[in-house]
Amino acid sequence: MAVQQNKKTRSCRGMRRSHDALTTATVSVDKVSGETHLRHHVTADGFYRGRKVIAK
């Protein structure tokens, strides 16, 4: 079983965890349909950057 050699300080622990924060997903609004979607993704009704790319 692994056992640490020396105790890690609160500072070292915090610096290690500084990259673990979660960010919210960036959401955009389509120009034509006004629907919200993830950036660089097609909307649910098939629009991408104001153009119909998927016919339903």
Curated annotation (Swiss-Prot):
Top-level taxonomic group: Bacteria
Keyword Ribonucleoprotein: yes
InterPro entries: Ribosomal_bL32, Ribosomal_bL32_bact, Ribosomal_zn-bd
A GO molecular-function descriptor: structural constituent of ribosome
GO cellular component: large ribosomal subunit
Keywords tagged on the record: Ribonucleoprotein, Ribosomal protein
Family: Belongs to the bacterial ribosomal protein bL32 family.
Protein name: Large ribosomal subunit protein bL32
Gene behind the chain: rpmF
